[in-house]
């Protein structure tokens, strides 16, 4: 919401400084986004052209002498419309042109010095929709004075208004809030004094209302849609609103001043009656912004007896019946509709306008008559015309809300002592009607423009807001001497950061179509009201979002990445309070940056296997406590992935992504990933192994077995370990080979076995017996054949 300081002062009687007003706005919850004092526009002044001569060396250039009320400047100009006696706008040397940010300097054009520039509307950033001017701006004699600043240098304040404070989307509402907080007094606007002297006929246009709402209208004939007054143009320009025509600018002014959207129709284009109804079927609509929209059942339209659509109600009017400069007869509409209906209608066509933005945040339903009267009065004043009587149709009744309010609740909730009289004044200042204020329980009726005051504690908040949050004394929380252990998530973050990964935080939403490619087509949680079409599902896996991050990083030229996220996943069985946390990680590209040691390589399954077991290790789960099973997940590579089970419960997986998924995200290199389901892992007590001093020498023996390619290597290792747990200290694989010399379908698996006794040195026979047990177990369990060479 943007407005000027002088605009605010139209409704607020105060001597407060700009700085104080800005500070107070923030104090009462109206966040000040910016304040523009327009110092950069002070160097654009109104001048009179007093002499024009052709340039001696350029046919299209003219040498002009312009007067700013103090001195004369020589300016070289190429505009065809420059002439003696005209008023225009001079940009002094050092000025910055609004359109293109060009800095004006002293220039020599074909040998002639030029001290400034005469500006066009386009260069000043004020091009009007119907403007055909191609030369410099020509100002009317009686509106602008030579020497004055062309732009209003009135400070412009911009506020971020929260959705619940629609009443502050008008300057009058902001002034009302400041006055309630003690900044001056609110100037009254007596709408009842506005009368129509020439009202002597009934509107030829009738209204029919088939939806919930209230519609009022006035037919005005014989208007002259002239140029907008200077002061009104300046107000609109300060708010970033372009001047269209006097009639349109007036209703925009009413909307910005009083948060009261209105709409104007060319009455000659309406066939007899306006019917406000919802659409039965899809239909195309040509809007006044020169765009075409496909309307659906969510949209409310205004149609006439010829079935022509004249507006999407509360959103935008039609190209057919928009008000132009040659329009003579108009129908002025002022309406209130259900905010939900307006929001759905606006969202259907993906168009938000100043009108719909306000209507969907609730506008005052009791201000229709006054808003219509004020707009009509201004149109008659500046454009002339003869108004009809007001035509009105109502399909909604605004009922006052009665709130039982205890003044003691301010102290109980806000921990401040405010007198009953102060509380009474605060509530009255914001427009509330307070009854029974001599009793313990007051009956408070919120004003019609404050739809956010629905409960008694809302009134407490209002009192505290106006009293000042800064006056509430701090009550520091006592610091406890108890030291709490680090949170598990923080420990896991530290572990993965030490693995060279970076943490990311992504949305809890994901794309349904992508999720289906991962096999998530049941037990999923769809979003009825997604923020966009690509985020229409609560994520069943964090992996989907991480892959999107990788894809976007690749698009920006980042070809190596290792990222992780600790977050929640969701399914249809999730209930409020469920903490389905997972740790998910993705590696892509090379494991290290390029270096002269040539230690960089492409990441593989063993990188994420290390990450996975580092997480488990932090949760007191050792490698020997879990079972690895070849993964059956469709989005993982069938030969380079594993599911991990703990106590027969699936607690995660790791592996390389299936090439089809990599292609889906348009990623150029293989990706490895892991995901640990933290919510499935029970708390495992930390068990410390007793230290055993290794006093006796170990012995290593290597074995090479021929086994089928279908053998689970992990199971082979486990079988070898269990043959003699007292003597076998470790079993590891140091080579897997297939190719020349190995039968088809077979593998050569080489094991390194470490033998050690805790109480004596092993002799040859003990080592031989233990080796024979390994050979026998693998032969029986896997049909393994010991290779002789």
Curated annotation (Swiss-Prot):
HAMAP family: Phe_tRNA_synth_beta1. Its cofactor is Mg(2+). Gene3D superfamilies: 3.30.56.10, Bira Bifunctional Protein, Domain 2, Ferrodoxin-fold anticodon-binding domain, Nucleic acid-binding proteins, Phenylalanyl-trna Synthetase, Chain B, domain 3. Its EC number is 6.1.1.20. Residues 398-474 form the B5 domain. One of its GO terms (biological process) is phenylalanyl-tRNA aminoacylation. It is found in: Cytoplasm. One of its GO terms (cellular component) is phenylalanine-tRNA ligase complex. Residues 694-787 form the FDX-ACB domain. It comes from Ehrlichia ruminantium (strain Gardel). SUPFAM superfamilies: Anticodon-binding domain of PheRS, Class II aaRS and biotin synthetases, Nucleic acid-binding proteins, PheT/TilS domain, Putative DNA-binding domain. Keywords: Aminoacyl-tRNA synthetase, ATP-binding, Cytoplasm, Ligase, Magnesium, Metal-binding, Nucleotide-binding, Protein biosynthesis, RNA-binding, tRNA-binding. CDD domains: PheRS_beta_core, tRNA_bind_bactPheRS. It catalyses: tRNA(Phe) + L-phenylalanine + ATP = L-phenylalanyl-tRNA(Phe) + AMP + diphosphate + H(+). Binds 2 magnesium ions per tetramer. This is Phenylalanine--tRNA ligase beta subunit. The keyword Chloroplast does not apply. One of its GO terms (molecular function) is magnesium ion binding. The keyword tRNA-binding applies. It is an enzyme of class 6 (ligase).
């Amino acid at each position: 919401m943007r407005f000027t300081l002088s605009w605010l002062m139209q409704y607020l009687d105060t001597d407060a400084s700009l700085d104080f007003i800005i500070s107070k706005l923030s104090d009462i919850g109206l966040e000040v986004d910016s304040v523009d004092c327009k110092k950069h526009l002070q160097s654009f002044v109104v001048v009179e052209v007093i002499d024009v001569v052709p340039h001696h060396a350029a046919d299209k250039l003219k040498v002009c002498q312009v007067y700013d009320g103090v001195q004369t400047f020589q300016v070289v100009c190429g505009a065809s419309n420059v002439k003696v006696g005209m008023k225009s706008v001079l940009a002094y040397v050092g000025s910055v042109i609004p359109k293109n940010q060009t800095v004006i300097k002293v220039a020599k054009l074909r040998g002639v010095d030029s001290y400034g520039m005469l500006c066009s509307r386009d260069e000043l950033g004020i091009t009007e929709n119907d403007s055909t001017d191609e030369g410099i701006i020509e100002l009317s004699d009686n509106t602008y004075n030579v020497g004055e600043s062309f732009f209003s240098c009135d400070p412009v304040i911009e506020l971020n208004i929260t959705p619940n404070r629609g009443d502050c989307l008008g300057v009058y509402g902001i002034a009302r809030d400041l006055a309630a907080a003690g900044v001056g007094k609110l100037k009254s606007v007596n709408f009842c004094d506005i009368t129509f002297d020439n009202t002597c006929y009934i509107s030829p246009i009738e209204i029919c209302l088939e939806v919930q709402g209230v519609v009022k209208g006035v037919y005005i004939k014989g208007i002259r849609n002239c140029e907008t007054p200077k002061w009104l143009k300046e107000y609109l320009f300060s708010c970033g609103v372009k001047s269209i025509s006097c009639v349109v600018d007036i209703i925009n002014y009413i909307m910005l001043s009083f948060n009261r959207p209105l709409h104007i129709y060319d009455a000659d284009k309406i066939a007899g009656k306006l019917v406000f109804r919802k659409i039965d079927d899809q239909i195309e609509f040509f809007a006044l912004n020169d765009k075409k929209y496909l309307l659906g059942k969510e949209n409310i339209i205004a149609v006439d007896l010829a079935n022509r659509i004249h507006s999407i109600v509360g959103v935008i009017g039609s190209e057919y019946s928009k008000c132009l400069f040659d329009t003579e007869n108009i129908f002025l509409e002022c309406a209130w509709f259900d905010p939900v209906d307006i929001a759905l209608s606006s969202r259907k066509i993906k168009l938000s306008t100043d009108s719909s933005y306000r209507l969907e945040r609730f506008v005052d339903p009791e201000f229709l008559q006054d808003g219509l009267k004020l707009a009509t009065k201004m149109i008659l004043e500046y454009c002339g015309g003869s108004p009809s009587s007001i035509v009105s149709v109502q399909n909604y009744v605004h009922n006052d809300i009665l709130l039982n309010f205890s003044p003691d609740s301010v102290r109980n909730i806000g921990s401040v002592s405010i007198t009953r009289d102060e509380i009474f004044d605060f509530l009255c200042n914001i427009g509330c009607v307070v009854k029974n204020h001599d009793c313990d329980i007051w009956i408070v009726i919120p004003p019609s423009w404050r739809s956010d005051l629905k409960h008694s504690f809302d009134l407490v908040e209002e009192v505290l807001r106006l009293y000042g949050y800064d006056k509430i004394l701090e009550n520091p929380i006592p610091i406890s001497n108890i030291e709490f252990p680090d949170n598990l998530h923080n420990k896991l973050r530290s572990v993965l950061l030490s693995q060279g990964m970076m943490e990311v935080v992504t949305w809890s939403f994901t794309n349904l179509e992508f999720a289906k490619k991962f096999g998530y087509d049941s037990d999923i949680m769809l979003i009825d009201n997604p923020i966009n079409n690509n985020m229409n599902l609560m994520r069943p896996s964090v992996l989907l979002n991480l892959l999107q991050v990788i894809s976007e990083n690749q698009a920006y030229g980042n070809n190596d990445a290792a990222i992780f996220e600790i977050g929640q996943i969701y399914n249809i069985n999730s209930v409020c309070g469920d903490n389905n946390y997972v740790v998910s990680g993705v590696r892509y590209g090379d494991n290290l940056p390029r270096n002269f040691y040539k230690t960089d390589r492409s990441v593989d399954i063993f990188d994420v296997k290390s990450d996975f077991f580092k997480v488990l290790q932090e949760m007191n789960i050792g490698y020997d406590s879990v079972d690895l099973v070849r993964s059956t997940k469709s989005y993982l590579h069938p030969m380079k992935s594993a599911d991990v089970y703990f106590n027969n419960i699936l607690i995660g997986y790791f592996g390389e992504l299936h090439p089809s998924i990599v292609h889906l995200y348009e990623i150029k290199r293989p990706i490895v990933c892991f995901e640990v389901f933290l919510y499935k892992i029970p708390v495992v007590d930390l068990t410390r192994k007793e230290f055993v001093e290794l006093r006796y020498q170990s012995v290593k023996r290597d074995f090479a077995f021929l086994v089928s390619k279908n053998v689970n290597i992990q199971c082979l290792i486990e079988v070898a370990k269990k043959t003699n747990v007292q003597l076998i200290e470790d079993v590891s694989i140091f080579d897997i080979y297939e190719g020349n010399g190995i039968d088809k379908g077979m593998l050569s698996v080489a094991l390194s076995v470490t033998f050690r006794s805790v109480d004596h040195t092993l002799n040859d026979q003990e080592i031989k017996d233990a080796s024979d047990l390994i050979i026998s177990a693998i032969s029986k369990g896997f049909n393994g054949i010991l290779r002789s060479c």
